[in-house]
């Protein structure tokens, strides 16, 4: 649905990244829309091998998103994924040793890290669409992360998804949100919705 919506709105997509590919649902939907440059990261070895077989024409990296080269910063048109969540810390020295306290905090929980690192990888005007736990928007301790994200991105949409959305697929009921951001590093003010 994300890829179809972007195509319907004439969003030019040349370069797509899925930072936590899993079974490749986003890869498939964007490839079907004619996106030529598709890169995916999948940390699990077996899942990554399967992805390479399913999508031989795409760049599949069997490693964690934290290993994406710095030269890839500011280069992707679209980044979309159903990202992992939890208090798992990420080993990324550029974050844990950063002077930016939001980056330091982001390295302490995987979902916050994916948001911050994802926006680093977007070109100006690029779109990030992540399905994530409700903790990103709900948790008071994530306030510095939300502020950092809103400082450098426009909030396109934030949708609270039904708790049973993944019941049939993954056998779990978890509160999830779809958050869509557009990179805007020159942003001067927050909208009323972004201040919430």
Residue ranges and their predicted role:
Residues 84-113:
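Mobile active-site "lid"/loop adjacent to the S-adenosyl-L-methionine
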Residues 85-86, 135-137, 165, 185-187:
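Conserved nucleotide-binding/hydrolysis micro-motifs of P-loop NTPases
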Residues 168-196:
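Flexible, glycine-/basic-rich loop-and-beta segments that form/coincide
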Residues 34, 57, 95-99, 145-148:
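Glycine-rich, phosphate-binding/catalytic loops in enzymes
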Residues 1-88, 132-135, 151, 179:
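Conserved S-adenosyl-L-methionine
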Residues 43-45, 106-167, 176-180:
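Conserved Class I SAM-dependent methyltransferase catalytic core
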Residues 92-93, 142-143, 170-172:
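Short aromatic-enriched loop/helix-cap "lid" or pocket-rim segments at secondary-structure transitions
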Residues 69-72, 167-171:
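Short, solvent-exposed polar/charged micro-motifs at secondary-structure junctions
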């Amino acid at each position: 649905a994300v890829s179809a919506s972007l195509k319907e709105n004439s969003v030019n997509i040349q370069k797509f990244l899925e930072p936590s590919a899993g079974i490749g649902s986003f890869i498939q939907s964007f490839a079907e829309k004619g996106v030529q440059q598709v890169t995916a990261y999948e940390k699990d070895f077996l899942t990554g091998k399967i992805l390479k077989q399913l999508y031989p024409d795409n760049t599949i990296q069997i490693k964690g998103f934290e290993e994406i080269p710095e030269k890839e910063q500011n280069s992707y048109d679209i980044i979309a994924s159903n990202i992992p969540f939890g208090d798992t810390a990420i080993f990324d020295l550029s974050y844990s040793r950063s002077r930016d306290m939001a980056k330091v905090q982001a390295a302490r929980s995987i979902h916050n890290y994916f948001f911050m690192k994802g926006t680093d990888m977007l070109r100006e005007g690029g779109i990030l669409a992540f399905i994530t736990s409700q903790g990103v928007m709900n948790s008071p301790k994530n306030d510095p992360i939300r502020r950092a994200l809103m400082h450098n991105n426009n909030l396109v949409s934030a949708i609270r998804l039904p708790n049973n959305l993944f019941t049939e697929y993954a056998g779990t009921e978890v509160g999830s949100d779809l958050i869509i951001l557009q990179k805007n590093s020159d942003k001067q003010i927050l909208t009323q919705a972004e201040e919430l």
